[in-house]
């Protein structure tokens, strides 16, 4: 039987704002093969780590949304156990419905802030934070790694995906211009329409041969083609903060968190710069 529990309902203002945004426009979650424990375990082994047996592992996904990534894992690994956590009541409700429809008995779902997850959940062999790190406040980022330090088992693996510099510098320029254009516009639908119209205008072919102009036009053209979900929760999201790898790794090294650092090295080695993280 799946577990359905709410916790930390008195979330900070920043988290409450994030929760409202995800309830205003549903995030179209999808599965990500790179975050599957089987894939993580293989790559981790190649890097000299000794990960847990995937068949009987314990997995925690932070920001599980409606379960599109977590539930297929649970359905295929019936002797493993899975826990999903998300701020959005709308997403967790959808995930619970899917668990019931699929008849899964190895899934527990929690609605609330990851920094206040109950100790009764136990420890985990694999922790997944896909499409979370770059889109949450600094306090939540710190809480993510603090949780990993407390709750990862020996030889546990933390999978983190995030927007990374220097590759995101051009995209960041596009995101900032979109933000400036829509900052005074109220309502999700109106903001989406305005952002698309703005991007379409700037994607029009220009007369210059400047390669930077061509690159920017390409990025604006991409904005006109992505889904409302991706535009609202990625390009128009606040925060949306890419980081350099050393910014992610250095604090973990200073805290003596060698396993998290090694896991980050594994993760960054298998994520192509052309892949969409979310």
Explain the meaning of each model-derived region.
Residues 142-154:
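A short glycine-rich, Lys/Arg-flanked "PGG" loop and its adjoining helix->strand segment in the class I
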Residues 118-127:
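A short acidic, Gly/Pro-enriched loop at the edge of an enzyme's catalytic core
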Residues 66-79:
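Conserved SAM-binding loop of SAM-dependent methyltransferases across substrates and taxa
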Residues 55-65, 157-186, 190, 194-211:
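Conserved class I S-adenosyl-L-methionine
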Residues 88-89:
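Conserved SAM/SAH-binding beta-strand->alpha-helix loop
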Residues 103-114:
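Conserved SAM-binding strand-loop segment of SAM-dependent methyltransferases
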């Amino acid at each position: 039987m799946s577990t359905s529990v709410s916790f930390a309902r008195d979330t900070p203002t920043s988290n409450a704002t994030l929760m409202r945004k995800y309830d205003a426009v549903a995030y179209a979650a999808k599965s990500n093969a790179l975050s599957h424990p089987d894939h993580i375990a293989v790559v981790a082994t190649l890097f000299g780590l000794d990960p847990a047996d995937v068949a009987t592992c314990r997995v925690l996904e932070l920001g599980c949304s409606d379960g599109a990534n977590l539930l297929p894992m649970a359905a295929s690994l019936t002797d493993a156990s899975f826990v999903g956590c998300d701020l959005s009541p709308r997403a967790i409700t959808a995930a619970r419905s899917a668990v019931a429809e699929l008849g899964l008995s190895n899934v527990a779902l929690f609605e609330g802030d990851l920094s206040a997850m109950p100790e009764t959940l136990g420890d985990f062999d694999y922790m997944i934070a896909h499409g979370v790190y770059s889109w949450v406040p600094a306090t939540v980022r710190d809480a993510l790694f603090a949780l990993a330090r407390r709750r990862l088992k020996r030889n546990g693996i933390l999978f983190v995906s995030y927007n990374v510099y220097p590759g995101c510098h051009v995209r960041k320029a596009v995101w900032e211009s979109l933000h400036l254009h829509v900052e005074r516009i109220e309502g999700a639908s109106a903001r989406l329409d305005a952002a698309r119209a703005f991007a379409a205008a700037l994607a029009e072919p220009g007369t210059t041969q400047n390669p930077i102009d061509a690159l920017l036009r390409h990025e604006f053209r991409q904005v006109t083609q992505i889904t409302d979900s991706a535009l609202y929760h990625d390009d128009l999201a606040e925060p949306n903060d890419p980081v350099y790898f050393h910014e992610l790794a250095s604090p973990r090294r200073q805290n003596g968190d060698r396993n998290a650092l090694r896991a980050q090295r594994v993760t960054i080695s298998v994520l192509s710069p052309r892949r969409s993280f979310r």
